């Protein structure tokens, strides 16, 4: 029983985990993480300001989150501070983010250090002005901490600054800087700088005996890097990994052949497509070279798979077939994807299953991606078992 997973983002990792848990060691193909490596650390099933009820975290998703080791999911919603100055609810969060629900009605110190991309007084004022802070009487204020050791640390990327604190010397220096600041809040809120490999937020919490955590990360920041490390650890245990770009997926007999650059082709009974949407490059914009040619979408690799937009199949691009972005809006970029049914089965392709942002018309959210990856893996296993 051979099953392949195409994609190394959240959906692909969830699918690989579920396959391994049920006794099938998958082959996982991916070159990059896609949009999963860009996420900020807040975990949702749908856009957070449209949520009307608390979504349930089922047993399968909770099991995957525990195995991944990078997320915190609970029976109630969390509340996080964003890098942009918002206080918002989240169904879960990456480990290291400060859960503000634990700090309701208390004094939260926003670390003030001289980085060019960080304005602690402005952020503290924005957090304090949020409806949640006013309702819970939570006080945010800036607190100067002299944690920079070199001038270039003012302007290096958030990822690089976080990585500096993986060393014992820098993590100890940061703790010392906080201790000598003369400030004794009920919680400390940092930017997304508390290490990549080490759980520095937990270490500081234990040393200071108050909650310590971060805001969300920017694109390509610490949260995405931590996910990638956790993914690599899980896949090393559960899957055969091929770090290569897939160029073709072709039907062969009752199964499929996967062709990737600088790899021998592999044949599989079923394949989970977790190749991402437009943001990840799994779905590409395509331009016709005809004189009056239009613009449309295609998969980034050759496969017998139809793309769908608003429940309509997206045909090849030509002067007669084109996506009108003026009429449809840029939201089209978040809607287009592989045409599949509720059971994740790719239309007209027995043995193919889609997950995550690769699916048409599904929320582009981390927990939705994980849930759909688990579902696609389960459906793939059901298909293979029926076929054999």
What are these regions (language model features)?
Residues 124-131, 165-248:
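Helical element adjacent to the flavin cofactor pocket in flavoenzyme catalytic cores
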Residues 297-363:
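FAD-binding beta-loop-beta segment adjacent to the flavin cofactor pocket
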Residues 1-28, 377:
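N-terminal Rossmann-like FAD-binding beta1-loop-alpha1 element of flavoenzymes
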Residues 232, 247-266, 271:
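Conserved beta-strand-loop-beta-strand element in the redox core of flavoprotein oxidoreductases
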Residues 27-54, 145-160:
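Conserved N-terminal glycine-rich FAD pyrophosphate-binding loop of Rossmann-like flavoproteins
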Residues 42-115, 121-133:
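Dinucleotide-binding Rossmann-like beta1-alpha1 core, especially the glycine-rich loop
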Residues 281-287, 352-388:
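A conserved FAD-binding loop/helix module that cradles the flavin
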Residues 3-6, 266-276:
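Short hydrophobic core segments
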């Amino acid at each position: 029983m051979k099953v392949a997973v195409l994609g190394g983002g959240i959906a692909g990792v969830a699918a690989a985990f579920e396959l391994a848990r049920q006794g099938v060691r998958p082959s996982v193909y991916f070159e990059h993480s896609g949009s999963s490596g860009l996420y900020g650390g807040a975990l949702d099933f749908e856009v957070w300001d449209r949520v009307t009820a608390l979504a349930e975290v089922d047993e399968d998703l909770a099991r995957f989150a525990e195995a991944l080791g990078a997320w915190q999911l609970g029976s109630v919603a969390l509340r996080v501070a964003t890098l942009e100055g918002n206080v918002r609810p989240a169904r879960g969060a990456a480990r290291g983010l400060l859960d503000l629900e634990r700090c309701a009605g208390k004094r939260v110190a926003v670390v003030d250090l001289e980085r060019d991309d960080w304005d602690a007084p402005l952020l503290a004022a924005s957090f304090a002005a949020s409806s949640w802070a006013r309702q819970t009487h939570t006080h945010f204020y800036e607190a100067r901490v002299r944690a920079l050791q070199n001038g270039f640390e003012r302007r290096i990327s958030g990822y690089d600054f976080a990585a500096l604190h993986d060393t014992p010397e820098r993590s100890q220096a940061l703790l010392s800087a906080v201790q000598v600041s003369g400030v004794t809040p009920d919680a400390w809120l940092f930017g997304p700088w508390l290490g990549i490999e080490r759980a520095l937020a937990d270490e500081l919490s234990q040393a200071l005996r108050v909650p310590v955590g971060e805001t969300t990360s920017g694109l390509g920041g610490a949260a995405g890097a931590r996910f990638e490390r956790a993914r690599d650890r899980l896949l090393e245990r559960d899957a055969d990994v091929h770090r290569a770009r897939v160029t073709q997926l072709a039907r062969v007999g009752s199964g499929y052949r996967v062709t990737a650059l600088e790899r021998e082709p592999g044949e599989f009974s079923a394949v989970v497509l977790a190749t991402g949407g437009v943001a990840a490059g799994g779905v590409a914009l395509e331009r016709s070279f005809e004189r009056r040619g239009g613009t449309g979408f295609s998969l980034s690799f050759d496969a017998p798979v139809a793309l769908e937009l608003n429940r309509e199949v997206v045909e090849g691009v030509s002067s007669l077939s084109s996506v009108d972005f003026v009429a449809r809006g840029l939201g089209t970029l978040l809607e287009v994807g592989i045409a599949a049914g509720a059971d994740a089965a790719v239309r007209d392709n027995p043995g193919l299953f889609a997950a995550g942002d690769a699916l048409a018309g599904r929320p582009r959210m981390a927990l939705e991606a994980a849930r759909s990856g688990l579902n696609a893996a389960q459906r793939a296993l059901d298909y293979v078992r029926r076929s054999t």
